[in-house]
């Protein structure tokens, strides 16, 4: 949007990086100096940097700021922040809400947090001029629950450059096709317990790499570590070159989730030309079509079967790899997605 000449401002929570200050990238360091990232203005808002309060406080202050600034459109992402969507709406702003998933269903949220997030969902259904959803399943949910029409505009992905294994070899002893990769947040709904239980029954000399940071779920991460065998590597949060190397050199990428919005990591994995194995939830199968393997959600035995099948059939893995990148980059093109979003911004407000 910025390249097309639009003035875009992002309001981001203050405080440290979710995985620690050491994970601030060089790009983010430059953004702190200039206030811009690739032509987009970035502003941090006052935030109570405490477990359970960061998202609530930052979305509240963002809503107040955007309500009183001279913006044509206020675009809110996720159900929790949508709790405040009525504020900019009352002051004449056109309000768009993107629903990334039914976040109140996530296992990590307790009573108040789940109520707050679901109330945000209801506020979006009532007050937003337009609602964007990332999956057909969520689109149907909004129609069935609220009688509210939404617009399906999925995430996009760009074709990356694959890179050779270097850092992952130095740090973890990993080589090309030497491991199965999971990359995402370490939270219960991602199906990681099923994955580890299935992996413990697999016959292979490959490693299982679980890459990603916990999100207020440190106790869950420790439980997984205790259940995992010696062939499982936990990297913690990763980014930059290390991230690209893990995607570029995996034998299989797997996403065993019980619950998703639209899994951006799955798009990224396919854009790197990975053979993917996902659970059969609609949010995953709609993305991959017949260009990946799937197993029955929550079924450890079926997950183990498909993992072993792919580990024992390198020709099948090669076939999936050869078609993945072309398929996904055509299907989820960022340029087309930006134009669809801009068209939505131009629609008249809802009264």
Regions found by a protein language model. Give the residues of each.
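Conserved acidic donor-binding segment of nucleotide-sugar-dependent glycosyltransferases
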Residues: 293-301, 309-315
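N-terminal strand-loop element at the rim of the active site
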Residues: 2-50, 137-143, 216
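Aromatic "clamp/platform" in nucleotide-sugar-dependent glycosyltransferases that forms part
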Residues: 256-258
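A conserved mid-protein helix/loop that constitutes part of the nucleotide-sugar donor-binding site
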Residues: 178, 182, 187-201
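Short hydrophobic beta-strand element within catalytic cores of glycosyltransferases
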Residues: 275-278
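Nucleotide-activated donor-binding/catalytic signature segment of Leloir-type glycosyltransferases, i.e.
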Residues: 221-241
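Membrane-proximal helix-turn-helix segments that form the acceptor-binding/catalytic region
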Residues: 64-67, 90, 114-131
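Short alpha-helical donor nucleotide-sugar binding micro-motif in glycosyltransferases
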Residues: 237-238, 245-250
């Amino acid at each position: 949007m910025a390249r097309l000449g639009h003035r875009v401002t992002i309001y981001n929570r203050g405080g440290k990086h979710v995985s620690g200050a050491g994970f601030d990238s060089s790009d983010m360091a430059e953004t702190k100096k200039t206030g811009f990232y690739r032509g987009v203005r970035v502003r941090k808002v006052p935030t109570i940097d405490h477990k359970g309060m960061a998202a609530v406080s930052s979305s509240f202050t963002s809503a107040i700021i955007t309500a009183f600034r001279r913006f044509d459109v206020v675009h809110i992402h996720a159900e929790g922040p949508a709790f405040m969507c009525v504020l900019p709406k009352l002051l004449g702003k056109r309000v768009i809400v993107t629903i990334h998933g039914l976040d109140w269903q996530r296992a990590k949220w307790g009573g108040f947090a789940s109520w707050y997030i679901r109330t945000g969902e209801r506020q979006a259904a009532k007050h937003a001029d337009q609602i964007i959803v990332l999956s057909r399943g969520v689109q149907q949910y909004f129609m069935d629950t609220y009688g509210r029409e939404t617009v399906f505009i999925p995430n996009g992905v760009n074709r990356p450059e694959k890179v050779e294994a270097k850092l992952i070899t130095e740090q973890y002893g990993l080589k090309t096709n030497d491991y199965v990769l999971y990359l995402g947040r370490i939270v219960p709904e991602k199906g990681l317990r099923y994955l580890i239980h299935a992996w413990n029954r697999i016959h292979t000399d490959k490693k299982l790499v679980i890459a990603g940071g916990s999100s207020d779920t440190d106790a869950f991460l420790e439980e997984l570590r205790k259940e995992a065998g010696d062939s499982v590597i936990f990297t913690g949060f990763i980014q930059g070159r290390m991230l690209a190397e893990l995607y570029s050199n995996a034998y299989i990428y797997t996403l065993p989730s019980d619950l998703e919005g639209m899994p951006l990591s799955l798009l990224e994995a396919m854009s790197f030309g990975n053979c993917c194995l996902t659970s059969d939830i609609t949010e995953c199968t709609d993305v991959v079509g017949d260009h990946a393997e799937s197993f029955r959600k929550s079924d450890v035995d079926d997950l183990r079967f498909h993992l072993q099948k792919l580990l024992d059939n390198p020709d099948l893995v090669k076939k999936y790899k050869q078609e993945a990148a072309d398929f996904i980059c055509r299907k989820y093109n960022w340029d087309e997605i930006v134009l669809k979003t801009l068209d939505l911004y131009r629609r008249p407000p809802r009264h």
